Regions:
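N-terminal transmembrane-helix/juxtamembrane module of multi-pass inner/ER membrane proteins
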Residues: 1-63, 98-122
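Membrane-embedded catalytic cores of phosphoryl/pyrophosphoryl-handling enzymes
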Residues: 2-6, 11-13, 113-212, 216-217
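Residue-level signature of transmembrane alpha-helical entry/exit and packing/kink sites
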Residues: 10-15, 75-83, 178
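Aromatic-anchored segments of alpha-helical transmembrane domains
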Residues: 20-27, 88-95, 160-171
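Alpha-helical transmembrane segments in multi-pass membrane proteins
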Residues: 21, 82-90, 94, 181, ...
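Membrane-helix interface segments
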Residues: 43, 74-78, 107, 149-155
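Hydrophobic alpha-helical transmembrane segments
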Residues: 54-67, 134-138, 145
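Interfacial segments of alpha-helical transmembrane regions
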Residues: 65-97
Length: 217
C-alpha cells in the first residue's frame, strides 16, 4: 500500500521553501534592480561562461559525453537521458509559464512590474521575464547533475546561481524571476529523477563500477 504522506511531504516542504524564497526575492527586487546592474556582464569571459549554463546545447553536449563514457554501464543510457531531458523540460516549462504569468522584463529607467494583456501576442514569449528561461535550464541541469554526482553538487549549484546572477546584472530579469526559475528547475529535476533514476537518485555508474572492481583490475 502506497504511503501518500511520505510521498507528498517532500513536495510540501519544497512548496513552503519556494514560496518563502520567491516572496523574499520580490521584496528585494527594487534593491537588486538598482545595485546589481552591470550592462557589460556579457562582454566578460566569466559572464559568457556562466550564461552558457542556461543554453540547452551545453547540457546536450554534457549528456552526450556522459553517454559515450558510460554507455556500457547498466544505467548509463538512462542517466544520460536524464541529464539531457531535465534541462530540456525545464526550458519548455519556462516558456509555458511565461505565457501564464505574462510579466514583462525590467525597464531600463524605472523600476516596476508590468503585465502583458492576454489578448496581446497571446502565444509569444518575447519580452516576457517570469520565470527566467536561462536560469530554469541552468538549475534543472545543475540539480540533475548534482543527483548523478552528489559530491560535486556545490559546484553545480554555484555555476547555476552564477548564471542566474548574470541575468539580473544584465537587467534581463528581476531577482524574483530567477529565484522562481531556480525553485522550479530543482522541482523539474527531482520529479524526473523519481521516474527515470533508481530510487530517485543515482551515483555515477563510474563510481559504482569502480567500487566493485578488483584492486588488481
Amino acid at each position: 500500500m502506497l504511503d501518500f504522506t511520505s510521498m507528498t511531504r517532500p513536495w510540501l516542504r519544497w512548496f513552503i521553501v519556494a514560496a518563502v524564497l520567491i516572496a523574499a526575492a520580490h521584496l528585494a527586487d527594487p534593491f537588486a534592480w538598482r545595485a546589481l546592474r552591470l550592462p557589460t556582464v556579457y562582454d566578460k569571459d566569466w559572464g559568457r561562461l556562466l550564461r552558457s549554463l542556461g543554453y540547452l546545447p551545453t547540457w546536450g553536449a554534457l549528456a552526450l559525453a556522459y553517454w559515450l563514457e558510460q554507455r556500457d554501464q547498466p544505467v548509463g543510457g538512462r542517466v544520460a537521458g536524464y541529464l539531457a531531458l531535465a534541462p530540456t523540460l525545464g526550458g519548455a516549462s519556462a516558456e509555458l509559464l511565461k505565457l501564464v504569468f505574462r510579466r514583462l522584463r525590467p525597464d531600463e529607467l524605472t523600476f516596476g512590474y508590468a503585465l502583458r494583456a492576454f489578448g496581446d501576442q497571446p502565444w509569444s514569449t518575447k519580452g516576457l521575464g517570469l520565470p527566467s528561461s536561462h536560469t530554469l535550464v541552468a538549475f534543472a541541469g545543475a540539480a540533475a547533475l548534482a543527483r548523478v554526482f552528489p559530491r560535486a553538487a556545490g559546484v553545480c549549484y554555484a555555476l547555476a546561481a552564477g548564471c542566474a546572477l548574470t541575468r539580473v546584472m544584465a537587467n534581463a530579469h528581476f531577482l524574483s524571476d530567477v529565484v522562481a526559475a531556480a525553485c522550479i528547475g530543482w522541482a523539474v529535476a527531482a520529479w524526473l529523477a523519481s521516474r527515470l533514476l533508481p530510487n530517485g537518485a543515482t551515483d555515477s555508474p563510474t563510481l559504482a563500477s569502480s567500487s566493485r572492481a578488483s584492486p588488481d583490475s
